[in-house]
Structure formats: C-alpha cells, structure tokens
Amino acid sequence: MKKDLLFWGTIISLGFLILLGSGYCQHITDETCSVQILVPGLKGDAGEKGEKGAPGRPGRVGPPGEKGEIGDKGIKGSMGRHGKIGPIGSKGEKGDVGQIGPPGPNGEPGIPCECGQLRKAVGEMDIQVAQLATEVKFVKNVVAGVRETETKIYLLVKEEKKYIDAQDYCQGRGGTLSMPKDEATNSLIASYINHAGLSRVFIGINDLEREGHFVYSDRSPMQTFNKWRQAEPNNAYDEEDCAEMVSSGGWNDVSCLITMYFICEFDKENV
C-alpha cells in the first residue's frame, strides 16, 4: 500500500514539472529551454526504528476459540455458610436397655399414722385373698366335671394328698371324702374314675380308731354293703388303715401315708 502511494506521488510530481517547463519556454523563445525530469532514485538504506506509536482502536471481537482442556483441580475452598435445617428424620429403633443406675438417696421419714384400723382391714383382706386363692386352686384341681345323685354331689380332685390331708381338704369346703354306701353310688364313683383316666382314688373308709373295724369318714359304721376285693382288707405290713377304690369299683386297704387323687362328697342341701 505504501509503495503504491509513493509511486503515484512521484508520477504526479513529474507531470507537474513538465507542465511548468513547457509554459516557461513559450515566453522565452530566444533562450534555451531546459527541462529537468525528476526520476526516483534507488532505494535507500533502512532507516532507524521509529518510536512506538499510539495504541490503535480495538478491533472486532473474534470468533470463539476452541474449548480448552480441563484444568487441574483447585484447592479446597473455605467452608460455606450453614444451609437450612433439614426435616425431622424418622423414628429410630428402640435401643438396648441401659445399665442399672446407682441407688437413689434415702427418702425423708414418712408421717406417722394411726394404723390400727388399717392393719385390721389389711389383715382381713389378706384372709379373704387367701381363701379366694384356695377356692380358685380347688376349682382348678377339679377334673372330669361333676357327678351327682338326688342328694349328693361328687367332685374328683386332681391333686395328690395323703388320706388325712385329703379328708381335711374336703371338710374345709363343707364336704367329706366320698362314701360309697350302696351299689349305685359305688358304680357312679367307679365310672367317674374311669372317665378321668385314673386307676385309683382315696375314698372315705378307714379303721384308724380300731383295727379291723372300718367306718366311713363321717364315722358311721359300715353295714352289709361293701366292695372289698378278694383277700382284702389284709392290713399288709400292719400299716394299711385307709381305703382306695380302683377303676373296676373294688376296694383295697392301703397305707394312709401314700398320696393319690381323691373324690369329695357334698350334700346338696349345704351347697
């Protein structure tokens, strides 16, 4: 671009000088007309480097460059501000039972009370509770239902006791050990034993007061009816003073100290 400007500048200057020379020679005809033609000289040596020019105007924004490679991971920044509190979490599972803590301090002395009436009431309550517990236990030990006649009720007690204890057990509830005084009653008790799946029970017959003289548990004497098995009573080892009934309905004399189930008998009028 600079070379073109220099060339055309030289041509224009040369033309201007030619015009001036031709006009000047027309007025001076008698004199010799000399024409000077300026011709560009040879290219000179390179000049010294000029001073740095002023900054040019900003150019247009170039197109976006290509995406560079991922840089190295930066240093961990400082902790940011706390965020909002999150929602309440679900209930966790129940933890293990903790260790037993140390005993606490002794409490202050209580206020003295007039406990005479209270002790009396508590004592009466204890008696009632004990009686109730005994009755409940009695009911639990009664098995195979109830057997009865027109005047009697029979209960089989599933609790092994000695003869005397069994008798006291029945008497404590208003009855006595069962007394089979006739064939019908004896058959009913035998059926009761079979139905319960037992082999024998105590019945209310003994000769505790007089050897060989058997009476019922109400101390009434035995009449003509009996169901002694063959060779019974035999008072084996000189210690068999009480009676049992086996599932067939027969009687044996046995020791009063062994334990077995028993049947209580109650009068319907007293129940």
UniProtKB/Swiss-Prot annotation:
Q: Which gene encodes it?
A: colec11
GO terms of molecular function: calcium ion binding; calcium-dependent carbohydrate binding; D-mannose binding; DNA binding; fucose binding; oligosaccharide binding
Binding of Ca(2+) 2, residues: 232, 234, 240, 252-253
Binding site residues for Ca(2+) 1 = 207, 211, 235, 240-241
Q: How does it assemble?
A: Homotrimer; disulfide-linked. Interacts with MASP1; probably triggers the lectin pathway of complement.
Pfam entry (one): Lectin_C
Keyword Iron belongs to the record:
no
Give a yes or no for keyword Isomerase in this entry: no
- Segments of this protein annotated with the region Disordered: 45-96
Q: Where is the composition biased (Low complexity)?
A: 55-64
Domain Collagen-like spans what residues? 50-109
Q: What is this protein called?
A: Collectin-11
Tell me the compartments it is located in. Answer: Secreted
Naturally occurring in which organism (per UniProt): Xenopus laevis
Entry keywords, A to Z: Calcium, Collagen, Disulfide bond, Immunity, Innate immunity, Lectin, Mannose-binding, Metal-binding, Secreted, Signal
Compositional bias ranges of the Basic and acidic residues kind: 45-54, 66-75
Q: Which family does it belong to?
A: Belongs to the COLEC10/COLEC11 family.
Protein's GO biological process = antimicrobial humoral response; complement activation, lectin pathway
Q: Which residues form the signal peptide?
A: 1-25
Q: Which cysteines are joined by disulfide bonds?
A: 170-264, 242-256
- GO CC annotations on file: collagen trimer; extracellular space
